């Protein structure tokens, strides 16, 4: 009798995210579990969109692995240049490379819903100023949610003061012009003081 193989896909994605964190820590000394926080923020935002079931699972996996090719890009660059130069070179002009590689990588995963272009467009801004110049109505909702969660996590971890980071986030959100996603993020992360 042949036994069917069962895979805990969320556990697998979590393990991959952890492995990517370890590689990133080794290559460029970044040790912050960014993928897990982006996944958590994305899931909080998804509640307000009533995303659940298979869609929520796929959003969580995409958020965990949104930078899955960043280490691939970094390791390729390190073969050419030093760590210091590589960190400086992770500019928006090069951002599209890890999005392209990452989108290609996730096509091999067993998603239950259509996640086409989620990783590819996760650095797009609502006003069309991202690496691929896509406006919000051309970007999948999951990519918009992950982009905003990504920005929020980066801001929250790069500014010391919570008040300053909250003010900066509100300013970014008001300029981002993706009001439905921005609003849900603000609602998901409201604090009594704000």
Mark where each language-model region is.
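Acidic/His-rich, divalent-metal-binding segments that scaffold phosphate/diphosphate chemistry
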Residues: 1-116, 120, 124, 135-138, ...
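Amphipathic alpha-helical "output/dimerization" segments
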Residues: 57, 140-147, 171
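Long, mid-chain structured domain cores
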Residues: 101-102, 119, 170, 174-177, ...
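Catalytic, metal-anchored helix/loop core of enzyme active sites in primary metabolism
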Residues: 129
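Conserved beta-strand-loop-short alpha-helix elements that form
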Residues: 144-156
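Active-site-proximal, acidic helix/loop segment immediately C-terminal to a metal-coordinating Asp/Glu
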Residues: 153-178
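Conserved small/polar residues in nucleotide/adenosyl-binding loops
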Residues: 184-193
